[in-house]
Amino acid sequence: MNENVLNKLKILAESAKYDVSCSSSGTVRSNKPGMLGNTVGGWGICHSFAEDGRCISLLKVMLTNYCIYDCAYCINRRSNDLPRATLSVSELVDLTMEFYRRNYIEGLFLSSGVVRSPDYTMERLVRVAKDLRTVHRFNGYIHLKSIPGASRELVNEAGLYADRLSVNVEIPKEENLKLLAPEKDHKSVYLSLIHISEP
């Protein structure tokens, strides 16, 4: 694996671990005397449950942890001084396929900071899922996080390739959202939910 991509993976897996949509996010626990096994974390492997109840391993990563927003509750907020990285669509597709072929994962959990605009970011997420499905014939699980403010068309297209779409409803009330994320629009969060629920 390319060292540059590996470094990006470390940064973006670390940034993704704060999204609690997966059951585990890279717990590290060393083997203890009298105990069996250990866990290895920090590489973006998390566990979730499939519809049939099976526990599946997912590559949990962000496309980028750069963000145009400065939400007080988010580790990836614009003003936070942390290592930043961006994977290209092809880097993430190749990484997913490499992990899948090695049986490290059974699927992908993909989110992203917002760069340029919600539509620009959502279009890149859709391209990852589309390339996995159509170019690489990937039959694993894909969970995409919808970007609040993205167009209905892009959310609908994402639904053609993802097994699951979700959106973070950060704050349920407009006045509270404005206190913690003044650049965000409460309506755009709920519109994303509506777009996802449309047939």
Specify the residue positions occupied by each region the protein language model found.
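Canonical radical SAM enzyme core domain
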Residues: 81-93, 120-127, 134-158, 164, ...
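Conserved radical SAM core fold
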Residues: 79, 114-117, 149-151, 169-186
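Residue-level detector of conserved catalytic or cofactor/ligand-binding positions
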Residues: 192-199
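Conserved, mostly hydrophobic/aromatic
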Residues: 58, 110, 167
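Non-cysteine beta-strand/loop elements that form the S-adenosyl-L-methionine
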Residues: 107, 164-173, 193
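Canonical Radical SAM [4Fe-4S] cluster-binding loop centered on the CxxxCxxC motif
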Residues: 61-90
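Conserved glycine-rich "GG(E/T)P / GGGxP" loop and the immediately following alpha-helix
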Residues: 109-127, 179
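Flexible, acidic/Gly-rich N-terminal and inter-domain linker regions that tether
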Residues: 1-66
